Amino acid sequence: MNISRIIICVAACLAVLTSCRKEDVIEKPTVTPVEPSGPADDPSRAVVGFYLLNEGNMGSNKATLDFYDAASGTYTRNIYGAANPSVAKELGDVGNDLAIYGSRLYALINCSNKIEIMDAATCRRMGQVNIPNCRFMAFDGPFLYVTSYAGPVVIDPDYKQLGYVAKVDTATMEVVATVTVGFQPDGIAVSGRRLYVANSGGYMAPHYERTMSVIDIPEFRVVDTVDIGLNLGLVLADNCGQIWVASRGNLYDVGPRLYCYDIAAREIVADLEISVGDMWLDDDLIYIVGNEWSNVTMKNTVSYAVVDVRSRKKVSDSFITDGTETRISKPYGVAVDPVSKDIYVTDGRNYVNPGDIYCYSPDGTLRWTTPTGDIPAHIAFLLR
């Protein structure tokens, strides 16, 4: 796969931006030299680079895509508009999840109620799937599974609309089935023949949800509902038959936690006092960044952690070793290169202006940093 196709596509499309969008003000892509991820002439390089989805503040319609080319060591901001000059309003409002599956790139745009589907090699748009208030994605076989709040963005302790999981045929890009789960379902993960869905009840404060819905994939129905903890968020499945579920607490007297659910035993086997803003599984380690807001102190507490999934214990309070974490205002996203093991941390800063991405070597020392779009959040690695 030749990643130069992305840059060529961007350059070619810049010439037609004005004619296609006479009434829009479109920020052109900007290319910043950083550092390559390894020897530029290495023919065995497995990771071509990564896409970064910037969420953009709600209501601003400023979700954008960036791309890091690992071979050339260049970081390009805002590539979607140039690659797709005829698409009105670009990506949309609030980019909430990003994934590469097969040869396609999937960007979930929460408040635009859609999943944008692109060619992973060129970023060219292939189509979209419309799902109201969509939140997170997981894949299994020929299907994409998407959590949906189903209802409008309304804070209401008596919210009546249950959420659901949509089953999308990746070939036809159509929703083929839905199954009802709890209120405001967020994270979703696949393990074996089942889906694990975290119900948050995030619109219903102080009456948050506590449950995780378990869905049988072949039958596509809920087969179990497990009490986990308050206001659940992200979910990931490890290689040890365990599901890790983050609880955000209630921002007052119940703090955030990270729970480990043993699938075979059908019980919680670990309860860790860790704030999870984002987490990434690499081999047997979970890398975590946290931002714990308190409505009591009206302060935000930043944290980092590494958890070993086999011991089910926190093995480090940080994966940054050179003290440069003090430069990061709001650690918002984290990812680990599956080959080089470089660690990426995004900084949301004030959630209004452009953020930054920091690249750390496996030993935790800073390699490079560069500006991003607004609220940089979700990373998907492009493999050769």
Stretches found by the model and what they are:
Residues 16-19:
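C-terminal motif of bacterial Sec signal peptides marking the signal peptidase cleavage site
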